[in-house]
Amino acid sequence: MALIQTAFIWVAYAVAVGIVALIAAIFAYTYQTPRDRSALVSTITIITLTSLLATVLLLPVDIALVSSTTSSKLGAKKDWATPETVRNILLTLKIVYYALYSLDAVLCLLVIPFTYFFYEEYDEVDTEEGTQTLGQRLLGAAKYTLFFVVLVVILFLVGFFAPVARGGGSDMDLDYFKRLLAENHGERALTFALGLLISLGTLLYILYTSVGLALLPMSFIKSAPSISAPQLSETTASALEQNRERQRQLEGRNVGRNAGLSAKDQRELEALHREERTLVRRERLAAEARGEGKSFIVKAWTKTCAIFRPLKLVGGILLLLLSVIIWASMLITGIDKAKNSFCKQHCGYILGSINIFQPLNWVFVKSSIVFPIDYVLMALLVLFLFSSSVTGIAVIGLRFLWVRLFEIRKGHTSPQALLMATVMLTLIILAINYSIAMIIAPQYAIYGAQTFCTNPTRFPGDQPDCSNHPELIKTCSELSSGEGAEKVCTPTVVSTFLNRVTVNFPFFGALAFWAQFVFLAIFLIVFVTALFRTPKLDLSELDEDAEADEEEGLLATTGRRFGATWQDIRGKAKNQTPSRGAAGRGIRGDDDHDDD
């Protein structure tokens, strides 16, 4: 039975990793610009994001395996859960964690920089002329990557020799905290490196994830009030007819004149030609949005999406509620830790036990009794925070101070920007891993649903029996003491690893903890601002994208959607007569106003 349960947990994890690999592939394909698509960049991006998400999704596996050794109803270890069996489970988890964390660090600090410089070394002209070889590109990329190799070596040397906290005081004499003080120099180096990467990721996390967490639900609820495809087609056709009629008037007015068009008429005609090109592109966008020239399946899918698009509002409201619950849960845990942590900044504000009801932690603890309910919930939470981070990066962009270096947009992200965004997501996901385990669901992440029996034993070595005394069953926590707690309560590997970072290097723990309050403040500011801000349709951006795609012969293949209305479903525009002057001025204003 134990073997079947363990196998089921690992199979569920393998399925989850397969799903996140698919999500990573969709992310890389969706955001990378088609005309500069690189197979190497896409592959590295997919591998990196899969490894990172697999690291975070190992948390519920860790909890499920550790909790499976205990009967929460009796507060005792199961018969098959001998000390040797438990040690083997923890050793397996530790090996997987070390492998994933090491892979994450290597990908972030070495592989991605090498890929970035390798792509930058490519010169199309030199390659076609045969003056640039693959070996030259590899050598050039390796030369620039050498700096990062030196950085990694220095990082691990500092961690290898860095002094760790010894934690004076009675509070740190508990067995749980003694085990956290790493004596192995190799573990200490990896702990220091992880703590530094988490700290760097936390700085990005409080900026990008907080903004995305507030704006992602709003993007579902308050979509840009853009025109439907049929309405855009009709309005554009009317404006195009007016434009061409005006061109005919100008040309007819100057027929027979030896001097040709006057300077004023010539400027107006040139402006009309530019406007005409813009209107033609918009017509094509509207036609593709309606599925014209596509197969029956594509047209049916377009209309189906139009029918179900109002469900975005319901989904947005649910995501908004989830965002508020996450914010409230983080605030509750932060206040609880700041007030009731027995070691404060000396151990990164480790909380001995939950003193204030925390909704998300309660949901996860209760659902962990029946696997894989908690696993599904945790996977959804991780993907939501990941999507929020992507949204934040897309909104803010890749910046140095106030200067935007790269833009992250669907179908318009360069390979260099995609690699830089992947590095940022790498660091952010490490910070998300800390936040979930230490702030969002602290009790669940450390002990899951484990309990222990406080009933005295009948003789030394016997297991306490609470079958007739359920009131003596207590929840496991860091401060749990006594023979029953020592034998039954087994902390998860990830909590031990993260707490080891904060106990051995308290600065990292204090930084990660207080940064959560900055995260909450930024979320609140952006959330309140988004409530009162009305999104607007940026037609100039549509025109620029269409023009760029047209130059490459790739005119808007994704078919931008313009709002779920009855017009999209019927494929017809509303019967209305737009003002001639307003239509002409409105569209011309999107192009060049300076030429009039």
Swiss-Prot record:
Stated membrane topology is: Multi-pass membrane protein
**Which keywords belong to this entry?**
Cobalamin, Cobalt, Lysosome, Membrane, Transmembrane, Transmembrane helix, Transport
Q: Basic and acidic residues bias located where?
A: 587-596
The UniProt GO MF terms for this protein read: cobalamin binding
Region (Disordered) residue ranges read 566-596
Q: Where exactly are the transmembrane stretches of this chain?
A: 7-27, 46-66, 95-115, 145-165, 196-216, 313-333, 350-370, 376-396, 420-440, 507-527
Per the record, the GO terms for biological process are:
protein localization to vacuole
Which cell locations does it reside in?
Answer: Lysosome membrane
Look up the domain of life of the source.
Eukaryota
- Provide GO CC annotations from the record: vacuolar membrane
Q: Which family does it belong to?
A: Belongs to the LIMR family. LMBRD1 subfamily.
PANTHER family assigned to the protein according to its UniProt record, in alphabetical order: LYSOSOMAL COBALAMIN TRANSPORT ESCORT PROTEIN LMBD1, LYSOSOMAL COBALAMIN TRANSPORTER-RELATED
Q: What does the protein in this record do?
A: Probable lysosomal cobalamin transporter. Required to export cobalamin from lysosomes allowing its conversion to cofactors.
This chain belongs to which protein, by name? Probable lysosomal cobalamin transporter
Organism of provenance: Sclerotinia sclerotiorum (strain ATCC 18683 / 1980 / Ss-1)
